[in-house]
Amino acid sequence: MTDAREKGFWTGPLEMADPELHALICGEVERQKKTINLIASENYAHQSAMEACGSVLTNKYSEGRVGERYYGGTHWVDRIELLCQKRALELFGLDPDVWGVNVQPYSGSPANFAIYTAVVPPGGRIMGLDLPSGGHLTHGYKTKTRKISASSVYFDSRPYTVGSNGLIDYEGLEKTFTDFLPHILICGYSAYSRDIDYKRLQSIAGRNGAFLFADISHISPLVASGLMNSPFEHCDIVMTTTQKGLRGPRGALIFYRRAVTKNGETVDLDARINFAVFPMLQGGPHNHTIAGIASALLHAGTPEFAEYTRRVVENSRELCSRLQSLGLDILTGGTDNHMLLVDLRSTGVDGAAVEHMCDALGISLNRNAIVGNSSPLSPSGIRVGTYAVTARGFGPEEMREVGDIIGGVVKLCREMTGGRKMSKADLHRVTSDARVMGSEQVLVLRRRVCALAEAYPIYE
């Protein structure tokens, strides 16, 4: 019989087996090394988590729950999943007799849909923060003319908003809730820089026995470290992704009270949540990812990680202060977490122009809709986060330098555009123009970016 090894069945290292793909990955490695990453939803995963994700665990199917699998040979992956669950509950100080956690969701969006599927009837009512106000797509986003997210297609969604100051309008929220009477009230946001009054939201949700669900994907490390209010005291269900502040692989955790009482009836959330994840929406869990999450959760429970989260907030506030000193407007006037939203309307440039020019200079951030914008595709703001740069080692001094660079980019964009909105093609032409990119103003900014990136290397 022919030896499969002789035919390359086992392929060998990526560099040898697929040099084309290897070269592309190496290109991304170099980009990450040379780029200042200010995207609020990104971070640098722990090397141990990446090692687990590249392990033989990817070979194993294990549909079902621990002890209730549909496959044999799950002894080791069962132990890994139990370890991940244990560490997740411990990180937030949760009593396992009161709280359960499902660690199988592939990422945050399907986790959210699983939650709705578990507790909201088909066509039932969900209520979350509007996307231009800082909510997430999966919280029921739709426009006046089109349903965008599946959460607005399969459920009846109605948004609440922030006020003109950028803060959640709790009075308006309460009025909308009373008019709409949703089955689930969603809090926790993707572009909101302030803390959340979970107690007040619990009081509102209790009016008709609605479930209160917190999506803390952006702020879960800050909650775990005690730097932000905890939703666990007041919410029925809590979800977080694992790749942002937790520095794990892409996945999600759904925490749920094992049983809750709604309108006089006991609801078995343990059964509902787990059944919604599997078999309703998913098949076999990604065991390699669960192992990577378990490793990240171990790190997240250390004093060193608590210090990291403290520095994340410190850096965010330092950057906020610097940008304000340069005359830039910050939505809500400040920040309580890892992100800030810069309102560019007074500068004469939009978020797309700043994002595009920053990208050309080696800074990653994203355009972001702010209150009053009609479309997230043509926003008036940018969202800036400090998880990744803090993991890299940046401190207050470096954040002031980052703020000065962003201020320089805004000034450059204003000079380039003359206050007019530019199309994506126009922006591409500008950043491809050797005269523009070779100007002294641009070269100085690029050198400053390179100096910061070189001073704080990654994965060495």
Curated annotation (Swiss-Prot):
Transmembrane segments: none annotated. GO terms for biological process: glycine biosynthetic process from serine; tetrahydrofolate interconversion. Its EC number is 2.1.2.1. Its main location: cytoplasm. GO terms for molecular function: glycine hydroxymethyltransferase activity; pyridoxal phosphate binding. Pfam families: SHMT. GO terms for cellular component: mitochondrion. It is found in: Cytoplasm. Keywords: Cytoplasm, One-carbon metabolism, Pyridoxal phosphate, Transferase. It catalyses: (6R)-5,10-methylene-5,6,7,8-tetrahydrofolate + glycine + H2O = (6S)-5,6,7,8-tetrahydrofolate + L-serine. InterPro entries: PyrdxlP-dep_Trfase, PyrdxlP-dep_Trfase_major, PyrdxlP-dep_Trfase_small, Ser_HO-MeTrfase, Ser_HO-MeTrfase-like, Ser_HO-MeTrfase_PLP_BS, SHMT-like_dom. Coiled coil: none annotated. The keyword Cell division does not apply. It comes from the Eukaryota. PROSITE patterns: SHMT. Pathway: One-carbon metabolism; tetrahydrofolate interconversion. The modification N6-(pyridoxal phosphate)lysine is found at residue 244. Its cofactor is pyridoxal 5'-phosphate. HAMAP family: SHMT (MF_00051). Homotetramer. Belongs to the SHMT family. This is Serine hydroxymethyltransferase, cytosolic. The gene is SHMT-1.
